[in-house]
């Protein structure tokens, strides 16, 4: 099930607004703080089964939360092409390695 990251980021933002994490007028820095919060949770996650998502470990769930928070942030700052940004960043790392 492939979904364009831009569309997924829009859905992440909608859910964040619906559950009260942000409002339509919130500064993008609120989403940036959420990345930090989710990252700290991931650092404490275990490899054991998640209580929220029983088919996944706490570490997998935590990593997904960090990604969702990051996509929400990119959406909030108006990133137009998330896929291109990620590919460009990966290519930068590849060039720096070679």
Place the predicted regions along the sequence by residue.
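Flexible "arm" and connector segments at domain edges
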Residues: 1-98
């Amino acid at each position: 099930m492939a979904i364009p990251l831009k569309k997924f980021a829009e859905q992440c933002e909608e859910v964040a607004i619906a559950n009260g994490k942000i409002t339509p007028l919130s500064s993008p820095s609120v989403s940036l703080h959420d990345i930090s919060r989710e990252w700290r949770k991931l650092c404490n996650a275990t490899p054991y089964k998640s209580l929220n998502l029983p088919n996944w470990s706490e570490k997998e769930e935590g990593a997904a939360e960090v990604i969702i928070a990051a996509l929400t942030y990119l959406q909030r700052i108006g990133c137009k092409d998330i896929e291109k940004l990620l590919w460009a960043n990966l290519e930068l790392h590849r060039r720096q390695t070679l």
